[in-house]
Amino acid sequence: MFSLYKKFKGLFYSVLFWLCILSFFSVLNEMVLNVSLPDIANHFNTTPGITNWVNTAYMLTFSIGTAVYGKLSDYINIKKLLIIGISLSCLGSLIAFIGHNHFFILIFGRLVQGVGSAAFPSLIMVVVARNITRKKQGKAFGFIGSIVALGEGLGPSIGGIIAHYIHWSYLLILPMITIVTIPFLIKVMVPGKSTKNTLDIVGIVLMSISIICFMLFTTNYNWTFLILFTIFFVIFIKHISRVSNPFINPKLGKNIPFMLGLFSGGLIFSIVAGFISMVPYMMKTIYHVNVATIGNSVIFPGTMSVIVFGYFGGFLVDRKGSLFVFILGSLSISISFLTIAFFVEFSMWLTTFMFIFVMGGLSFTKTVISKIVSSSLSEEEVASGMSLLNFTSFLSEGTGIAIVGGLLSLQLINRKLVLEFINYSSGVYSNILVAMAILIILCCLLTIIVFKRSEKQFE
């Protein structure tokens, strides 16, 4: 269905490089606005729960899109899908930039950005899977991972500098740089043949509605949205169990290691993403620092450390096993959260230091989750299973950002609930951090129990 010019095999790696650039900007687009959330809240005079939708909106369509593009690649050639993705990403950037003074136009632009950018990470996996032998796929995925990690690391730094010295609205047009890749992709990538596979549009719509309802619930805690989420989610589950080509394979639900990886990964990714989105608010409230300082001095060291921890985590998994590395990663995250919670007013640099270990722990758990999920799938299930893992990861991050934004807006936790010696202005952050640490520990304990009971299935 899709191929590169056979006579010029060397061009494949050039194509891979350009696709990595696209993935870089998709991740950059996720991280770059994070440090500016407090400034955006001041600009629109909105609560964190509402403001965080600037990132949540992007992650919402981005997560759904990653799964949809993977399905579409089965019967629409990748060249067309990539061009559509780039075009939508640039269109969304333009809409958001022009309408940045109008909140709902800004959100709409971010939704369109997410739809377009979702094409890049999902389709690059398809390109590698179809054009590189299994023996060489490790190097390709390693290269992709490094580029993505670089985007995660540079995002806060670039965002802080541009927002501080120019204006946060200019961050919205950064993805438009990807338009320069279109002529190259048109020249090198040739169209393939489409198949007669059908796409489960009803399943996509039902799942999307249920996700939107849940995220709206986390923003203002209106129980109507939770009821609607439950209704649409139940309908979605019944739907995928009846159709012949479901959007999500219901048989995967019976795979214990796969579901454990999905649950544990989703919870941890959600919590850490929420923490990252909370840091700029915390730094602004307690230390009154500008966005450039937040991006370069607080967040940047931690996000860049992921590259080192990722390599070290892979080494430890081979030597000590998946469970050991997962426990180590979970402890690193939870201890870091508790340290910041107890000493949140001590020094900004303590947060910087502990942020490194939060991201290190996240890198360890990501390595383990990927191995658990991939090793639990048969050859026929790999494509749909890994696609579902990517979807869950991105969706969890968006959900975490929405939940933390909603919690920061709640008056109930804006008081000294846990640590009496913390000032009221810092109490909300300490409360959330302690709750996050407890959830991470409970997740770790659950993983250990399930892992021990089903140890043979994890081998």
UniProtKB/Swiss-Prot annotation:
NCBIfam families on file: tet_MFS_K (NF012183), tet_MFS_L_K_45 (NF012175)
Gene name tied to this protein: tet
One Pfam family named in its UniProt record: MFS_1
Keywords: Antibiotic resistance, Antiport, Cell membrane, Hydrogen ion transport, Ion transport, Membrane, Plasmid, Transmembrane, Transmembrane helix, Transport
Family: Belongs to the major facilitator superfamily. TCR/Tet family.
Cellular localization per UniProt: Cell membrane
Alphabetized InterPro entries for the sequence: MFS, MFS_dom, MFS_trans_sf
Protein's membrane topology: Multi-pass membrane protein
Single GO MF annotation: antiporter activity
Top-level taxonomic group: Bacteria
GO biological process, alphabetically ordered: proton transmembrane transport; response to antibiotic
Upper taxonomic lineage: Bacteria, Bacillati, Bacillota, Bacilli, Bacillales
Primary localization: membrane
Stored Gene3D superfamilies: MFS general substrate transporter like domains, Multidrug resistance protein D
Cellular component terms (Gene Ontology): plasma membrane
Function: Resistance to tetracycline by an active tetracycline efflux. This is an energy-dependent process that decreases the accumulation of the antibiotic in whole cells. This protein functions as a metal-tetracycline/H(+) antiporter.
Protein name: Tetracycline resistance protein
Transmembrane segments: 12-34, 49-68, 81-100, 105-127, 140-162, 166-188, 201-218, 223-240, 261-283, 293-315, 322-344, 348-370, 391-413, 428-450
